[in-house]
Amino acid sequence: MNTFGQQPTNPHAQDLLDMAMYCDHFSLYHQQQNQQLPQRPAAPPATGYGLNEYSSPPSSPYLWLNGPAINSSPYLNGGSGSPYFPAGYGGGQRQFLPPSSGFGVADFPWLSIPNQADLLKMVRPPYSYSSLIAMAIQNTPDKKLTLSQIYNYVAENFPFYKKSKAGWQNSIRHNLSLNDCFKKVARDDHDPGKGNYWTLDPNCEKMFDNGNFRRKRKRKSESVGAGFDEDSNEDKKPLALKSLGSDSPQGASVLEQSSYDAAPEGKSKAPVGSAAQDSSHCFTNFASNMNALINNRTPRQFTAGRGDFSNSRHYLAELTSCPIPSPQISAPQTGSKVPCYPSKQQNNLCTSVMNPFGLNHLYSREGEV
């Protein structure tokens, strides 16, 4: 127990003492190894550096944009701290970009340009040529400008257009001549000068209001459609009705039918003329003839293996005597049409009438030749 109590508190203390003894015996080996290997820099002290040994953070986050991130470190030549790199490591290096005299760090810390005006010269304004013309005209008290005055306004307010004037000036002229929103106004007699004035069409002023100059010009079809009178029934009539006219009987019937079709939904549409009365009279005659055909059925006579259709022809002749309405008066639509067969019994009757003949009419009975 006493031997355990005499051990040092650190369990690795004995190992460190043993390693120190072995290192003393091999001191010659260490001297030879130090002669062969290059001299390593001394390790920095364990206590750390003082606050005065650290440099201020670089003003630019990128090393290649004129920042002092390379030459201002205390670890390079001339630093107050411990020389981590050998002397002369960064002495022959140079900055990637030369320092700029007018660099605005507060405005653009990531871009090396003289000032903000140079940036505006490189960026094209997000406006079309017609929008630029409208802006120039609206910013004048007289609301009219000559071509040269429009050029001057664009060049003064947008530095991008100060270069290569030939290109955008041609576009300005084309927009003035092809766009319907711009109107040419002649000069007055008391106004000397060269060139006509250009003004903005009053119908197109809403396209450039509230500083929104990016909207496209309105199509001609929309402007024409806006002037159409929706309450005019004369314009809504088809060409066929206009050509027939209301004087001719065909035109009167078609107009009557078109007025029936044009009735508003939700209201009952009355049938045209006496079509309902004719259909009811036709159905009455049809039902009476069919009842007579079914109840007073006569025995069939067969000759030469074929049926005798004389009676059937008689009843069919009576059915065809029903008056048919005029084809000029078309029947009403499905929603308001009077049903020709209102009951189920009449539907069955119609089915039997539509097929009055069976196979027995066409073929002889069994055993009869």
From Swiss-Prot:
This protein's UniProt keywords: Activator, DNA-binding, Nucleus, Transcription, Transcription regulation
Keyword Transcription regulation on entry: yes
DNA-binding is among the record's keywords: yes
PROSITE patterns: FORK_HEAD_1, FORK_HEAD_2, FORK_HEAD_3
Major subcellular site: nucleus
Residue numbers spanned by region Disordered: 215-252
Domain of life, per lineage: Eukaryota
UniProt tissue specificity: Localized to the animal hemisphere of early cleavage stage embryos. Zygotic expression is restricted to the dorsal part of the epibranchial placodes of the head within a region located near the tip of the first, second and third visceral pouch.
An individual GO BP term: regulation of transcription by RNA polymerase II
Localization, UniProt: Nucleus
DNA-binding region location: 124-218
InterPro entries (alphabetical): Fork_head_dom, FOX_domain-containing, TF_fork_head_CS_1, TF_fork_head_CS_2, WH-like_DNA-bd_sf, WH_DNA-bd_sf
One GO term describing the cellular component: nucleus
Pfam assignment, any one: Forkhead
Molecular function as annotated in GO: DNA-binding transcription factor activity, RNA polymerase II-specific; RNA polymerase II cis-regulatory region sequence-specific DNA binding
Function in brief: Possible transcriptional activator.
Full protein name: Forkhead box protein I2-A
Organism: Xenopus laevis (African clawed frog)
Lineage: Eukaryota, Metazoa, Chordata, Craniata, Vertebrata
Gene from which this protein is expressed: foxi2-a
